[in-house]
């Protein structure tokens, strides 16, 4: 029985010890364990696999993906980072720039501004095309000139009072429709995601006048096309108390973990510790600094339970980004199967 439990732990748990981590590699492949049928089976996979949405708001999404291998989870994360397309500034035509910011630095800053535009409604620009069209390009104009405020107090030293337009923000970017874009996109839908991103600072007489072309691209080509601010995953924590912890030791145990992980209850007049919500733990391993309590707790992670956190830049809602990443992954699988079929035919 003990041997069976040890094997099951090796197969399903990554165990964190005081001086190292055990069972870090996936070992449940066919033939590795006697008495276990680890051959891949689609029906069994469909039965065990699930996705649970834990939290979603305008720009962030947390969900659990259960029943998959680390390779698939990481492929999904990499697709979110680098292969879901967005629109971003690609070309900057500078007519006049007398600010302290050099042209190339200014163009780089503009490229990193997230653009609120659905990339699914646009095509990739053909390589070598210099002039954009309404199906592959968005055009923005930025024209700001700094002047002195004639109504400012004489003894004022506040730039906000002394100067007009001395800070250039993304709100100064004006969308210029190409072709029939004005009919396709209502006013206000094509814009920078945030209107308060500082681009440059000016002083009286300085001016920025330029034209921007936004095109469709992916983060694999340049980070400015990445649709997510963060896309990460972690394994679900699994915390087990190996023996009862009571009295002051229970309070001490709860302080060794993140708030909400260990709960102290009153049972028959005694304080008793129990694991309330291991999901909240950050695995600081503070428990191993306590000589009395480190032997009564087992810290582990569930090998096939991934907690995904996706934070959108605001270009698209996070649930849309996840669905688009799934489509990209499915497309990769189809191409792989097509390649296999082509090899078999040859």
Swiss-Prot record:
The modification Phosphoserine is found at residue 4. It comes from the Eukaryota. GO terms for biological process: transcription by RNA polymerase I. It is found in: Nucleus; Nucleus, Nucleolus; Cytoplasm, Cytosol. SUPFAM superfamilies: Insert subdomain of RNA polymerase alpha subunit, RBP11-like subunits of RNA polymerase. Pfam families: RNA_pol_A_bac (PF01000), RNA_pol_L (PF01193). Its main location: nucleus. The modification N-acetylalanine is found at residue 2. PROSITE patterns: RNA_POL_D_30KD. Changing residue 279 to Q: In TCS3; no effect on localization to the nucleus; no effect on association with RNA polymerase I and RNA polymerase III complexes. Keywords: Acetylation, Cytoplasm, Disease variant, DNA-directed RNA polymerase, Leukodystrophy, Nucleus, Phosphoprotein, Transcription. The keyword Nucleotide-binding does not apply. One of its GO terms (molecular function) is protein dimerization activity. One of its GO terms (cellular component) is nucleus. InterPro entries: DNA-dir_RNA_pol_30-40kDasu_CS, DNA-dir_RNA_pol_insert, DNA-dir_RNA_pol_RpoA/D/Rpb3, RBP11-like, RNAP_Rpo3/Rpb3/RPAC1, RNAPI/III_AC40, RNApol_insert_sf, Rpo3/RPB3_RNA_Pol_subunit. Belongs to the archaeal Rpo3/eukaryotic RPB3 RNA polymerase subunit family. Component of the RNA polymerase I and RNA polymerase III complexes consisting of at least 13 and 17 subunits, respectively. Pol I complex consists of a ten-subunit catalytic core composed of POLR1A/RPA1, POLR1B/RPA2, POLR1C/RPAC1, POLR1D/RPAC2, POLR1H/RPA12, POLR2E/RPABC1, POLR2F/RPABC2, POLR2H/RPABC3, POLR2K/RPABC4 and POLR2L/RPABC5; a mobile stalk subunit POLR1F/RPA43 protruding from the core and additional subunits homologous to general transcription factors POLR1E/RPA49 and POLR1G/RPA34. It is linked to Treacher Collins syndrome 3: A form of Treacher Collins syndrome, a disorder of craniofacial development. Treacher Collins syndrome is characterized by a combination of bilateral downward slanting of the palpebral fissures, colobomas of the lower eyelids with a paucity of eyelashes medial to the defect, hypoplasia of the facial bones, cleft palate, malformation of the external ears, atresia of the external auditory canals, and bilateral conductive hearing loss. Leukodystrophy, hypomyelinating, 11: An autosomal recessive neurologic disorder characterized by brain hypomyelination, delayed psychomotor development, intellectual disability, tremor and other neurologic symptoms. Some patients may additionally manifest non-neurologic features, particularly dental abnormalities and hypogonadotropic hypogonadism. DNA-dependent RNA polymerase catalyzes the transcription of DNA into RNA using the four ribonucleoside triphosphates as substrates. Common component of RNA polymerases I and III which synthesize ribosomal RNA precursors and short non-coding RNAs including 5S rRNA, snRNAs, tRNAs and miRNAs, respectively. POLR1C/RPAC1 is part of the polymerase core and may function as a clamp element that moves to open and close the cleft. This is DNA-directed RNA polymerases I and III subunit RPAC1. The gene is POLR1C.
